[in-house]
Amino acid sequence: MQIILAKTAGFCFGVNRAVKLTYELLEQGRPVATLGPLIHNPQVVEDLESKGAITCDSVDDVPDGCEVVIRSHGVGQSVYDKISTRRLAYHDATCPFVTKIHKIAARAGAEGAMLLVAGDAKHPEVQGIVGHTTGKVEVFANLAELEKLLPELTQQKSIFAVAQTTFNVQSWETCKEFLKNQCTNAKIFDTICNATWARQQEAEDLSQKCDHMVVIGGHHSSNTQKLLQVAARHTKAINVETADELDKDWLNGARIVGVTAGASTPSSIIEEVLNCMSEEIRDDMSFEEMLAASEAKPLYAGKIVKAKVISVSPTECVVGIDGSKHTGIVKLSEMSHDPNAKMEDLVKVDDELDLVVVKTNDQEGVDTLSRVRFEAQKGMKDVSEAAENGTVMEGDVMEANKGGVV
């Protein structure tokens, strides 16, 4: 039996940052209280509690003197207000992608626009998003629920539409198409994070190559359940939280088994499940070697990378960087030197690009990339080779001046 571990399996940078921060506070002997379970992984939460962390349902439950950790899901504005009223110290581990949605929600309220949120109304991330707008808001889980809102949507002067960061990518694309056709006054923001997009895309591809798929992660984890849905469309798929839940008989007859894991799944649990599945992983490749093969390669300024376009706006496009869990941003000025160029004319969703890394940001997991710099490097190389080979090159004259032409 061959076992293939997805490159995107395991902690995303947002979850990793929240977990790392909380462990560091506990190691310093600080009294820590998290608002809700820090992540949707019972094993990690239990370990944190064994080291002294307290899980509280609300700010009212936080003991005096405790330092509050706001989890990556984020919270509504009223929660920040309560923390301030109680004068509690707090550490904000909200995922930057979620923070971006909070700002959009606040803007919707300020501009009198209705806020549409694609997601699970009971999920803490969605509840936090809703808590940042002061205007009318509706949450829908799928196209059918969105269609039921149409009579109300047609009465709105302005609509802002966002998605939970872990929402199903295909479902979001379908909902966006509906909004574009039915609501000309809707401003649609692509807010599914790159880690979610890349994880679902890899699960889609991997599940089509495998006889079985094992999805490791919390049963209450939104992104884990989305991965299970994606994988189950193409092959037999199962969700396990720990190695103890894996029924080895379920694997009987499978030649190739794919393994992926949700954003809240630590590598230790992935290792336990893999070891439970087989003592001979990929021709005796150890878990450490297998994990190393799946881990993202470091990015640095000047590195040339391949990326796929996830979303396009008038001012920038968002890309998924091959071999990385980071998101890439390409500004219009870094896509073309043409002052009249429009981003939607330059690239489309799913286009594959060669880009140069301009700046990395490990804290937020968002990197700045450039197409024009890649073209400049490639152009210089082509010119050098042409000079050496005596090749005649052609180009467009953009401007004539006293010194010649540009």
How would you name each of these model-derived features?
Residues 1-280:
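The feature marks the mature, well-folded catalytic cores of soluble enzymes
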Residues 279-406:
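Single-stranded RNA-binding regions, centering on S1/OB-family and related RNA-binding modules
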